[in-house]
């Protein structure tokens, strides 16, 4: 089994700026993810064009099991991890979840190898 991914599409709430969300992601949110075993990479993409108020947050995990643990932490941590709860509350003030996809890597290769 390959790496596992969580891809979430977030939309800024009216009156919120992308700069605030980007700043929170690069500091507090990233800091919290570093404490969770199995989280390999975080990528935040800003949509352009008609959907420029949307962001795509991709989280890469070592395995499906690491993803399951991350979901458990995400659901339970706000009850006992004050810093995590504060960051999630800020995140949810800035934007709302529009869509979510999860799955494992099927194919990953450089285009020069084709």
Language-model-detected regions and their locations in the chain:
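Active-site-flanking beta-strand signature of metal-NTP-handling nucleotidyl enzymes
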Residues: 2-11
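Glycine-rich acetyl-CoA-binding "A-motif" of GNAT/NAT acetyltransferases
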Residues: 4, 53-54
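Long, acidic serine/threonine- and proline-rich intrinsically disordered regions
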Residues: 104-108
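Conserved "boundary/linchpin" sites in short secondary-structure elements
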Residues: 109-113
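Short, surface-exposed ligand-recognition loops at beta-strand->loop->(often short) alpha-helix junctions
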Residues: 11-25
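An amphipathic, aromatic/His-enriched active-site/gating alpha helix that lines ligand/cofactor pockets
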Residues: 27-41, 60-102, 114
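A short beta-turn/loop motif at secondary-structure boundaries
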Residues: 45-52
